[in-house]
Amino acid sequence: MKRALTAPALFAAAAVVAPLLATGLASCESGFERNDQIVNSLRILGAATHIDNGDGTDWADAEVGDTITLSALVANPNAIATVTVTWVTCLPNLNNTLTPCADENVLQNPVNLIGMAGVLQLGVGETIQYTVPSEVQPLLDQLVTRADANLNAQCSVYIEAPLIVIAQGSDGSVVTAVKNLRLSPWSLTGPGASDPALQHYIRNANPSITALNIPSDASACAGQTLVASCKSDADCDGGGTCSTDGWCPPAPFPAGNQLICGQIPATDVDIQTYYYCGLDGVDGSEMEYPTITWYSTGGSQGGVTNKNTAGTPDLASRTFINFTRPSAPFTLYGVVRDGRDGENWIAQAFQ
C-alpha cells in the first residue's frame, strides 16, 4: 500500500510555511482541488517547478542558488482578452507572528496580497524564473541538523514552501491556486552522501507524459498515438513541426467513447524509488505511482475502475480515462503528479 507522504516539521524561521499549511488557504479556490473536469471558465489546472542543473533531468527540488522555472497551466476557454498570472509568497518571520499569507481576512481576497508589506512577489507570467536566495540557507541547515539528530527524519530532508498563484482576467474574474515548492539541501543528500544521515533522501524529479494514446489493452499505455512529445522537428513523423511546448501535430481525435491514456516513461527519473522512515530510521523503499487528472473544454468523461483493490491503484485507474469528444473543437488536459511535489502536463487542442 502506498504510504502517505508527509513533510517534516517546519522551523520557527520558516513561519511563513507552517501557518500557510495550517490554514490550507481555505479562503482560496484551488484550481487543483476542484473536481469539475469540464473547464468552462478561467482555471488554474496545475503548476510545476522545473530546475535544470545541466544533467538532463527535470528536477523538482531546489536549493540555494538554483534558478527555478515556475509554470502554471492556465485554461482560458472563453478567450478572455488578457489574463495576468502573479506568483507570491511571504517572507519568513523569525518572530512567528502572523504573515499576510496566513491571515484569513487577507486570503478572502488573495489579490490584496499583491504589493502588501511582507509579501514577496516572485514574478508575473504563466512561466517565470526565480533564484532561491541565500536567506533560505539557514532553513536547509536546520534540516541537516534535524536528520542528524532524528532517525525518523532521514527520509524527509526537505521543506515545502507554498506559493500562491493568482490569475486575473481583464473581465474581472480571479482564480487562485497553491503550489508547494520543495526545498532540500539536495547536493548533500542521496546514496553517495558523506553524512550517513542524509543518504536516504532522494531528490525528487518531475514525472512526464510522452504521448497521448488510445491503448490496445488496459495493461499498458500503448496503441494508437494521438499526439507525441518531441524535442525537435525530427521527432515528428511526416515532417511535422515540433511545437514550442514540445508536442508534434496531433492526429484526428475519433468520435464515440474512447479509452485514452497518458504514457509515462518507466524510468528511474519519471517513476522514482524513494525511502520511507519510521521511529527507528529507514523502514524500506517503494516506487512512486504517478496519477493523471484529466480535464477538457467539452465532451464527457468517465473513470476507469481499479482492479487492484488490495493495494496501490493499477495503471489504468491512475492514468486512463473514458472520454467522448464533443463535435466542436476542444482542448484536452492531462496533469500528472507523483505525490512528492513533482508535476507535469499535456494541454492539447483537437479540431
Protein language model features and the residues they cover:
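Extracellular acidic, Ser/Thr/Pro-rich low-complexity tracts
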Residues: 73-79, 169, 264-275, 282-284, ...
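Solvent-exposed loop segments of extracellular immunoglobulin-like
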Residues: 80-86, 287-295
